[in-house]
A protein has these predicted regions:
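Extreme N-terminal basic, low-complexity initiation segments
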Residues: 2-12
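HIT superfamily nucleotide-processing domains
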Residues: 12-167
């Protein structure tokens, strides 16, 4: 009996060491973690205990801001709900501030790529908030002649499947 407890405790300790080392490695390798730590420079718009917002160094337009959790989180599925809500509140405040700033933009996009197929390149979750202007030549490609326009019953079936997957 005691041996089993020791093994589990030892496994727990080893798991925590591996988890800690992985987190330390990620903090040293991830460009956004390095920005959070202060080992890389950033033009900071906002910082608190949960998130940080700073200027994108490859902006779509002047005023392009990235909002990130200060803890390393790669994907939306791994993001704490309260931190996610806070992240979006900060992004919303930035979106409201952009048209009031010297840029006086005509619109704002918020964009989050989650996973390789979605175009995620930096695997530290980040929400883009950037000003838009008519004729700024940036846009999401949307094919208006989609090959399949689903019937309502198909949409209902897909909605039910997603609803069941909500946790």
């Amino acid at each position: 009996m005691h041996g089993g407890g020791i093994v589990r405790k030892g496994h727990f300790i080893v798991s925590k060491i591996i988890e800690s080392n992985s987190r330390d490695l990620m903090m040293n390798e991830c460009i956004f973690c390095r920005i959070v730590k202060g080992s890389l420079p950033a033009s900071v718009v906002h910082r608190d205990g949960f998130c940080m917002a700073f200027m994108d160094i490859q902006p779509v337009n002047t005023g392009h801001v990235l909002v990130i959790p200060t803890d390393h989180v790669a994907y939306v599925a791994d993001l704490d709900e309260d931190v996610g809500a806070h992240l979006f509140r900060i992004a919303q405040r930035i979106a409201v501030a952009l048209p009031r700033s010297f840029m006086q933009c005509e619109g704002v996009n918020m964009f989050l790529a989650d996973g390789v197929a979605a175009g995620q390149e930096v695997f530290h979750l980040h929400l883009h908030v950037f000003p838009r202007y008519r004729g700024d030549r940036f846009g999401f490609v949307w094919n208006s002649s989609l090959p399949h326009i689903p019937a309502r019953d198909e949409l209902d079936t897909v909605a039910e499947n997603i609803k069941k997957a909500l946790t």
